[in-house]
């Protein structure tokens, strides 16, 4: 599920 990978990347970027 790419959505999970994207969500993880976004969370990291955001953080």
Swiss-Prot record:
GO terms for molecular function: acetyl-CoA C-acetyltransferase activity. One of its GO terms (cellular component) is cytoplasm. It comes from the Bacteria. Keywords: Acyltransferase, Cytoplasm, Transferase. Disulfide bonds: none annotated. The keyword Transit peptide does not apply. Its EC number is 2.3.1.9. It is found in: Cytoplasm. It catalyses: 2 acetyl-CoA = acetoacetyl-CoA + CoA. Homotetramer. Catalyzes the condensation of two molecules of acetyl-CoA to produce acetoacetyl-CoA. Belongs to the thiolase-like superfamily. Thiolase family. This is Acetyl-CoA acetyltransferase.
């Amino acid at each position: 599920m790419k959505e999970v990978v994207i969500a993880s990347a976004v969370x990291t970027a955001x953080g």
